[in-house]
Amino acid sequence: KVFEILDMDRSFIEEELKLFALSSAETAAFLKIGVEEFQALVK
């Protein structure tokens, strides 16, 4: 279930970022920061 939740959240975030028309590099950097923060909260 955790993976399903992560997948849904990631897809939702990607859709939101598309609204801001960010470049691929900016999107990747944003997602990387988000994942690192999420992993820190999980630990």
Swiss-Prot record:
Annotated compartments: Cytoplasm; Secreted
Q: What range(s) does the EF-hand domain occupy?
A: 1-20, 22-43
One term under GO cellular component: cytoplasm
The GO molecular function terms of this record are: metal ion binding
Q: Does the keyword Metal-binding apply?
A: yes
Chief site of localization: cytoplasm
Identify the keywords attached in UniProt to this record, alphabetized. Calcium, Cytoplasm, Metal-binding, Repeat, Secreted
Q: According to its UniProt record, in which tissues is this protein expressed? A: Detected in muscle and cutaneous mucus. In the skin, detected in cells in the basal region of the glandular epithelium of the dermal mucus glands (at protein level).
List residues binding Ca(2+) 2.
37
Please give the family membership noted in the entry.
Belongs to the parvalbumin family.
Described function: In muscle, parvalbumin is thought to be involved in relaxation after contraction. It binds two calcium ions.
- Name it: Parvalbumin beta
